[in-house]
């Protein structure tokens, strides 16, 4: 998870200016920065609006900052828009506050939660330790059910530390297994990112050439390679029983399964790769799929490869949604 919150939570937030700077939490994942600005401009003149995105993957982290010209408009925005329902989210609007060391690195990763626990249940469980800035429960993209994994960002690192001390190894109600509570890892510090940077961002590394790896770095099943070329449409769930399905868009016409294997293999166990081809030409139609067995490995692959330049193409990499791509 990116530390964008700490980096941006207090731009120009000193003295009276602090009463004009707002933090907006629980934004819909697909909301753009322009839409954020437009929404808050309905209250008064907005000096700046910033949607916070993951520094590696580029996707929205679900919160942003709006700085008004006047404190009066900022107050009106809180009174008017706090609690507003947007799509499936209820946004939270409040004053931002100055950044300091005590609020950095306060983001937790929780796994092993009962699948019946909702986002509200998780917040209720952890709220005793302090103010929760935002939270997210990961869900199966097909069923909408919890995957038993959540992220919680506290107001202060000390609050997060207390939560770890109290709940790591704890069995919550309805669970027969203890949960894991730890600080969320920053993808920028992950060794896989460094590996891929060395592997693909070197001047000599471009699409089409062989890549030499140690064999043990790949846990790939050749039986999983799907050479079907006649699909006009596919509908692969983001998480099927076989693993997590990743969608790769903007591949070149000459892309094949081998390049997907080479790109995703360093991140973990790949069980299936598929390039979607034109029925007549057998050329890649511009997209493909990779299935990985482990969520964290799949998420790291996405965080590292989304926006990666392959030849003259900039790839878009994300978890597969339910929508069919034709």
UniProtKB/Swiss-Prot annotation:
Cross-link (Glycyl lysine isopeptide (Lys-Gly) (interchain with G-Cter in SUMO2)): 191
Description of how the protein assembles with itself and partners: Monomer and homodimer (in vitro). Interacts with ANP32A. Interacts with ZNF385A; the interaction is indirect and mRNA-dependent and may regulate p53/TP53 expression. Identified in a mRNP complex, at least composed of DHX9, DDX3X, ELAVL1, HNRNPU, IGF2BP1, ILF3, PABPC1, PCBP2, PTBP2, STAU1, STAU2, SYNCRIP and YBX1. Interacts with AGO1 and AGO2. Interacts with IGF2BP1; the interaction is enhanced by SEPIN14P20 peptide RBPR. Interacts with IGF2BP2 and IGF2BP3. Interacts with HNRNPL. Interacts with DHX36; this interaction occurs in a RNA-dependent manner.
Residues where Phosphoserine is found: 2, 100, 158, 197, 202, 221, 318
Disulfide bonds: none
The species this protein was found in: Homo sapiens (Human)
Entry keyword annotation includes Acetylation: yes
The protein's role, per its UniProt record: RNA-binding protein that binds to the 3'-UTR region of mRNAs and increases their stability. Involved in embryonic stem cell (ESC) differentiation: preferentially binds mRNAs that are not methylated by N6-methyladenosine (m6A), stabilizing them, promoting ESC differentiation. Has also been shown to be capable of binding to m6A-containing mRNAs and contributes to MYC stability by binding to m6A-containing MYC mRNAs. Binds to poly-U elements and AU-rich elements (AREs) in the 3'-UTR of target mRNAs. Binds avidly to the AU-rich element in FOS and IL3/interleukin-3 mRNAs.
Gene3D superfamilies assigned: 3.30.70.330
Protein's UniProt keywords contain Zinc: no
SUPFAM superfamilies on file: RNA-binding domain, RBD
Record note on what altering residue 158 to A does: Decreases phosphorylation by PRKCD
Family: Belongs to the RRM elav family.
Localization: Cytoplasm; Nucleus; Cytoplasm, Stress granule; Cytoplasm, P-body
Domain RRM: 20-98, 106-186, 244-322
Positions bearing N-acetylserine: 2
Entry's Gene Ontology molecular function annotations: double-stranded RNA binding; lncRNA binding; miRNA binding; mRNA 3'-UTR AU-rich region binding; mRNA 3'-UTR binding; mRNA binding; protein homodimerization activity; protein kinase binding
Consequence of substituting residue 221 to A: Decreases phosphorylation by PRKCD. Nearly abolishes phosphorylation by PRKCD and translocation from the nucleus into the cytoplasm
Modified residues (Omega-N-methylarginine): 206, 217
Domain notes: The first RRM (RNA recognition motif) domain is essential for binding to AU-rich elements.
Name recorded for this polypeptide: ELAV-like protein 1
Tissue: Ubiquitous. Detected in brain, liver, thymus and muscle.
One Gene Ontology CC term in the entry: glutamatergic synapse
């Amino acid at each position: 998870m990116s530390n964008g919150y700490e980096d941006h939570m207090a731009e120009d937030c000193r003295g009276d200016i602090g009463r004009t700077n707002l933090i907006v939490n629980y934004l819909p994942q697909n909301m753009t920065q322009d839409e954020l600005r437009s929404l808050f401009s309905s209250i008064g003149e907005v000096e700046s609006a910033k949607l916070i995105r993951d520094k590696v993957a580029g996707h929205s982290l679900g919160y942003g900052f709006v700085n008004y010209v006047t404190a009066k408009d900022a107050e009106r925005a809180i009174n008017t828009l706090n609690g507003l329902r947007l799509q499936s989210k209820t946004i939270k609007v409040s004053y931002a506050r100055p950044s300091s060391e005590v609020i950095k690195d306060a983001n937790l990763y929780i796994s092993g939660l009962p699948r019946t626990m909702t986002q509200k249940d998780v917040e209720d469980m952890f709220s005793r330790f302090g103010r929760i800035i935002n939270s997210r429960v990961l869900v199966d993209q097909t069923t909408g059910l919890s995957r038993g994994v959540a992220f919680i960002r506290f107001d202060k690192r000390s609050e997060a530390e207390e939560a770890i001390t109290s709940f790591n190894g704890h069995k919550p109600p309805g669970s027969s297994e203890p949960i894991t509570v730890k600080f969320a890892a920053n993808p920028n510090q992950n060794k896989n990112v460094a590996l891929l940077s060395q592997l693909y961002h070197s001047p000599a590394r471009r699409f089409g050439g062989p890549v030499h790896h140690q064999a043990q770095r790949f846990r790939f099943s050749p039986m999983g390679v799907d050479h079907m070329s006649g699909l006009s449409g596919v509908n692969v769930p983001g998480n099927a029983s076989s693993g997590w399905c990743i969608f790769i868009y903007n591949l070149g016409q000459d892309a094949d399964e081998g390049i997907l294997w080479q790109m995703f293999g360093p991140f973990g166990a790949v069980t299936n790769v598929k390039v979607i081809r034109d029925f007549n030409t057998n050329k890649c139609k511009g997209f493909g799929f990779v299935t990985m067995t482990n969520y964290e490995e799949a998420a790291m692959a996405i965080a590292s490869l989304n926006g990666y330049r392959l030849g003259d193409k900039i790839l878009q990499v994300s978890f597969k949604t339910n929508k069919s791509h034709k």
